[in-house]
């Protein structure tokens, strides 16, 4: 089975299932010399961790263990292996519905591809959002590496259940979402109202995450098939429950005239740059030195307490299923950290390919540490 690895020069492979013994990631291509500890990984994992208000009540501590690739507190240039053990597993919930694939989930697709007898029905198995904890652990490594370039990657919710929330104008503002349980920049009472209503209806809501790479350098991305926006699209659409991807103004540009849809090219600080973010900081799929802005849409959580039509996979008799278990009323809240992580992983891969990051060894200085502290100082 392929499809478990992303990246060329800086690659991340995730492994494990929702109700297995553990999940984890193997990072290959991380240069030597990067200070790295399990506490660094926890900085990011704490924002994705389940068990908080308006998230799944499954209480996973998400404590990572670095098994390889780090010596005397710094990366060695060898593969970094990370394991996160599953602690709060209740597989009995799924015994009642293992013969009735859940509507909206990957159950039916996995059954058709791998066969019913090989399908791990417990909590969604490999297709579960639980897998994304491994991505966030790897994303912490990528974010630290980007600090060497002065790049900050931050995301926030701009839409929840059809209610819109503001975007950020700078890195400092965007990082405020890290302290919000709803991952919004303001108006938390509006977000809480949306989620309370969904819970009262025994339903769920979707949303949109916006993420920005601030101080991104020019030259990330290759022509044609390895464009930066193409790799970002692949990374974002690989996240469970993602259903749409935009760069800059995205689909809005399709409704404008050419005279309205272009970013101006101006002279600023002794160089040519773009004014505006309609193109999302990329032209021809290559970064131009402006902030790179993307959006990812997430569907509502499919596991809800409202019955839906399905079939018994053995008899093919139509029936209804009401999904038990512990689930998020809005997966988009915890998806923010996953979007940031995948964003950072893709940027590091392209930075190494572009020669902007040394693939063998990095020199960690005070400027790198200052960038990392922007994340570490904003943990709830």
From Swiss-Prot:
Record: residues binding FMN: 126-128, 284, 299-303, 326
Cofactor(s) for this UniProt protein: FMNH2
NADP is among the record's keywords: yes
InterPro entries with a match to the protein in the record: Chorismate_synth, Chorismate_synth_AroC_sf, Chorismate_synthase_CS
KW Amino-acid biosynthesis (keyword) present: yes
Top-level EC class: lyase
Pfam family, one: Chorismate_synt
Pathway(s) where this gene product acts: Metabolic intermediate biosynthesis; chorismate biosynthesis; chorismate from D-erythrose 4-phosphate and phosphoenolpyruvate: step 7/7
Positions contributing to NADP(+) binding: 48, 53
UniProt superkingdom: Archaea
GO MF term (any one): FMN binding
Cofactor note: Reduced FMN (FMNH(2)).
EC number per UniProt: 4.2.3.5
Purpose of the protein: This reaction introduces a second double bond into the aromatic ring system.
PANTHER family named among the record's database cross-references: CHORISMATE SYNTHASE (PTHR21085:SF0)
HAMAP family the UniProt entry points to: Chorismate_synth (MF_00300)
Family recorded in the similarity comment: Belongs to the chorismate synthase family.
Protein name: Chorismate synthase
Species in which this protein is naturally found: Ignicoccus hospitalis (strain KIN4/I / DSM 18386 / JCM 14125)
Recorded name of the encoding gene: aroC
């Amino acid at each position: 089975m392929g499809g478990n690895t992303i990246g060329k020069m800086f690659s991340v492979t995730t492994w494990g299932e929702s109700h297995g013994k553990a999940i984890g990631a193997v990072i290959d291509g991380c240069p030597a010399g990067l200070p790295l500890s399990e506490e660094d990984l926890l900085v990011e994992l704490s924002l994705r961790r389940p068990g908080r208000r308006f998230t799944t009540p499954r209480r996973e501590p998400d404590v990572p263990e670095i098994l390889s690739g780090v010596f005397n507190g710094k990366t060695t240039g060898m593969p970094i292996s990370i394991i996160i053990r599953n602690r709060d597993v209740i597989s009995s919930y799924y015994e009642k519905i293992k013969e009735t694939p859940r509507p909206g989930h990957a159950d039916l697709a996995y059954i058709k591809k791998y066969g019913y007898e090989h399908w791990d029905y417990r909590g969604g198995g490999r297709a579960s959002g639980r897998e994304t904890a491994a991505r966030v652990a790897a994303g912490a490594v990528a974010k630290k590496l980007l600090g060497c370039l002065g790049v900050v990657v931050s995301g926030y919710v701009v839409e929840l259940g059809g209610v819109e929330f503001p975007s950020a104008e700078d890195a400092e503002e965007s990082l405020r979402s890290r302290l919000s349980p709803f991952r919004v920049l303001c108006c938390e009472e509006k977000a809480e109202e949306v989620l309370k209503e969904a819970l009262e209806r025994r339903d769920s809501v979707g949303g949109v995450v916006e993420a920005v790479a601030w101080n991104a350098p020019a030259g990330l991305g290759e022509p044609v098939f390895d464009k930066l926006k193409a790799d970002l699209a692949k990374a974002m659409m690989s996240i469970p429950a993602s259903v749409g991807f935009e760069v800059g103004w995205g689909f809005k540009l399709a409704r404008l005239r050419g005279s309205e849809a272009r970013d101006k090219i101006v002279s600023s600080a002794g160089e040519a740059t773009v004014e505006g973010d309609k193109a999302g900081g990329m032209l021809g799929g290559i970064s131009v030195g402006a902030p790179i802005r993307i959006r990812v849409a997430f569907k509502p959580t499919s596991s809800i307490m409202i019955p839906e039509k399905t079939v018994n996979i053995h008899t093919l008799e139509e029936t209804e299923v009401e999904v038990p278990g512990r689930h998020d009323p809005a997966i988009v809240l915890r998806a923010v950290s996953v979007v940031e992580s995948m964003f950072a992983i893709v940027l590091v891969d392209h930075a190494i390919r572009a020669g902007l990051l040394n693939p063998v060894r990095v020199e960690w200085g005070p400027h790198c540490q200052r960038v990392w502290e922007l994340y570490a100082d904003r943990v709830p």
